[in-house]
């Protein structure tokens, strides 16, 4: 995993790390804390006031009656202008354009709120082939010579077992 700061970000080094090395990069301090605080407040508001919308791949949490400790907030574009600001950051756009091509699009934009004690999600990969265990469902010749998907995670809180 390669780490960058906003000032040290290099799109070519990032692409190399994503495609040929670990597949993961971290960009530290990419956003200002006021924007993160605003986004967190909106996510928490909707998580507290909307009907429960669970995440996928959470059979264990459901079986243990802990499903209420995790919630998905969908359609962030419609929840506040701050979410458009965050996702349209130059670093994200330069990286996604180079990795996926200039006509890439956002297939989903949501927040996953995990409260302390949450089990999180079962291991999976997202679209286009989430079930990495059933190779017979893959098209012939599937390989990683080009990217089909990329995910950006914007943490609104510090990740830890205690925080969820």
Predicted regions span which residues?
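Non-heme Fe(II)-dependent double-stranded beta-helix
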Residues: 1-22, 27-142
């Amino acid at each position: 995993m390669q780490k960058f700061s906003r000032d040290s970000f290099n799109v070519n080094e990032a692409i190399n790390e994503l495609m040929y090395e670990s597949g993961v990069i971290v960009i530290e301090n990419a956003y200002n804390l006021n924007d993160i605080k605003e986004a967190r407040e909106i996510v928490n508001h909707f998580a507290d006031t909307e009907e429960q919308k669970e995440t996928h791949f959470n059979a264990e949490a459901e079986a243990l009656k802990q499903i209420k400790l995790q919630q998905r907030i969908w359609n962030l574009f419609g929840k506040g202008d701050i979410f458009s600001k965050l996702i349209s950051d130059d670093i994200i756009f330069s990286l996604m354009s180079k990795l996926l091509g200039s006509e890439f699009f956002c297939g989903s934009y949501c927040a996953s709120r995990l409260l302390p004690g949450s089990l999180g999600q079962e291991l999976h990969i997202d679209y286009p082939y989430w079930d990495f265990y059933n190779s017979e469902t893959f098209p012939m010749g599937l390989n990683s010579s080009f990217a089909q998907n990329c995910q950006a995670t914007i943490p609104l809180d510090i990740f830890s077992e205690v925080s969820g």
